[in-house]
A protein has these predicted regions:
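Residues at the starts of beta-strands that form the adenosine-phosphate
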Residues: 39, 71, 170, 217-218, ...
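Acceptor-binding helix/loop patch of EC 2.4 sugar-transfer enzymes
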Residues: 102-125, 165-207
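An aromatic- and histidine-rich active-site surface loop
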Residues: 125-142, 150-184
């Protein structure tokens, strides 16, 4: 785990209104271990390049890590991110039911247990992608565990991610904010009881995310406010939480 920590919390958190910190050459060198760059796996259960934010985040984070000299691989479910040259992409296909008709799924696709889970979840108004991606990426990484020094999960928060930690892989997770906050906003704006039921159904993955987050050893978030929300809503103790502010490009 010694290799992981410099990427998570190299500096104490600055005051709220402090300028963002830019690593200098010495600090960039400090995250290199054993005379070689780190081999970083960045995980995203869906990484659309132009909407939702996850694909944008993975593009810029992977680019910055590569510019620091690290060997970066993004492992993603569909839709896949647009990455800069030099960053590798491992595609883990799913049914991707938000880009196709539910009834276009073939019998062969439903022969897979994870495919069935995605299909029946979508049929009943749920969202199973974080859970199913967690299982797929767990199986893939356990087969390639010796190829990476750090596994950085982008808010999948699935049981499969916890399995990787239990297996001894160095795992860090970014939680931008707990989606429990989105759920509250959605419920507050919907007076119709049947739609409120559907909103709660879609957000059922939050039970899994809360259980997983409370057991993770290393969590990155982007602000003190998000850290407080994560502690309150997900029951995360202060120890695993590290605030690392989002970078801002000034060029």
């Amino acid at each position: 785990m010694a290799r992981l920590l410099p990427l998570v919390a190299t500096h104490p958190e600055p005051p709220i209104n402090a300028p963002l910190h830019t690593p200098n050459a010495a600090e960039a060198h400090a995250v290199v271990r054993d005379g070689r760059p780190l081999r970083v796996a960045l995980l995203g259960y869906r990484s659309a390049p132009f909407s939702g934010g996850q694909g944008v985040y993975l593009r810029y984070l992977s680019q910055a890590l590569m510019q620091l000299g690290h060997d970066v691989t993004v492992i993603s479910g569909p839709p896949y991110p647009h990455l800069v040259e030099g960053v590798k992409l491992v595609q883990l296909p799913s049914l991707d039911l938000y880009s196709r008709d539910l009834w276009s799924v073939t019998r062969e696709e439903l022969g897979d247990s994870l495919g069935r889970k995605e299909w029946f979840s979508k049929l009943s108004g749920g969202f199973a992608e974080p859970e199913t991606f967690g299982e797929r990426v767990r199986d893939w990484l356990l087969d390639h565990a010796d190829e990476f020094d750090v596994v950085h999960d982008n808010q999948t928060l699935a049981e499969g991610i916890l399995d990787l930690q239990r297996a001894g892989l160095p795992v860090v997770t970014t939680i931008h904010h707990p989606i429990t906050r989105d759920l509250r906003v959605a419920l507050a704006g919907e007076p119709r009881w049947w739609w409120r039921l559907m909103i709660r159904r879609w957000h059922r993955f939050l039970g899994m995310q809360s259980r997983v987050a409370a057991q993770l050893r290393h969590i990155v978030t982007v602000s003190r406010c998000s850290a407080a929300d994560i502690a309150t809503d997900f029951g995360v103790r202060p120890g695993p939480l590290h605030v690392v502010r989002n970078g801002v490009g000034t060029a």
